[in-house]
């Protein structure tokens, strides 16, 4: 994990927008990402016939979201991911489900959560990923959002977290994270 250095490009496209009138009750978006690993060839191990294409991985999601009230928003996203090169015992093609939400506690303060679960099993039972869970607090301003969260996954790429996560939130395997985003 620590030797993995990704270059990531992502796109998100709104297909449908929820309307206040209720004529369209949901929002639907497509999210896709392509990642290229920038680590050295030695990461692939001795005796491996290495090619550039082994560095590439993909994730695709259709995000179905709904704002139920001024306080509560939820989303669910079927997920397909593909890693061109995987360690022995893992599958290249994987599928999962993501769910997330936000509850506006008061003012610009919100509780947020995300849950991701890999639905297919790996070739080796010992390598099945643990579900991912993140619980957080967000403070929003006109131009920034500050997030502090506890999560049981440590990677920056969803496709690697889905497949390789071995941390169990219920066993105390969690990390503290912090994000700052700027709105333009």
What are these regions (language model features)?
Residues 1-5, 15, 32-38, 80-84, ...:
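Transmembrane beta-strands of outer-membrane beta-barrel pores
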Residues 9, 26-30, 74-78, 109-113, ...:
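Transmembrane beta-strands of outer-membrane beta-barrel proteins
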Residues 9-13, 60-66, 99-103, 135-141, ...:
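Residues on the lipid-exposed face of transmembrane beta-strands in outer-membrane beta-barrel proteins
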Residues 124-184:
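Predominantly the C-terminal beta-signal and adjacent terminal strand-loop region
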């Amino acid at each position: 994990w620590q030797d993995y250095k990704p270059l990531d490009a992502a796109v998100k496209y709104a297909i449908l927008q929820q309307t206040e009138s209720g004529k369209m009750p949901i929002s639907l978006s497509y999210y896709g990402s392509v990642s290229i690993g920038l680590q050295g060839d030695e990461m692939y191990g001795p005796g491996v016939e290495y090619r550039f294409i082994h560095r590439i991985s993909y994730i695709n999601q259709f995000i179905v979201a709904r704002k139920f009230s001024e306080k509560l928003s939820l989303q669910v996203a079927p997920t397909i991911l593909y890693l061109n090169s995987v360690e022995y015992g893992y599958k290249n093609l994987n599928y999962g489900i993501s769910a997330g939400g936000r509850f506006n506690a008061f003012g610009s303060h919100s509780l947020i959560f995300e849950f991701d679960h890999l639905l297919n099993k790996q070739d080796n039972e010992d390598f099945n990923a643990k579900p991912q869970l993140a619980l957080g607090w967000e403070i929003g301003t006109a131009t920034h959002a500050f997030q502090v969260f506890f999560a049981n996954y440590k990677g920056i790429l969803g496709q690697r977290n889905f497949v390789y996560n071995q941390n169990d939130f219920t066993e105390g395997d969690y990390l503290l994270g912090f994000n700052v985003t700027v709105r333009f």
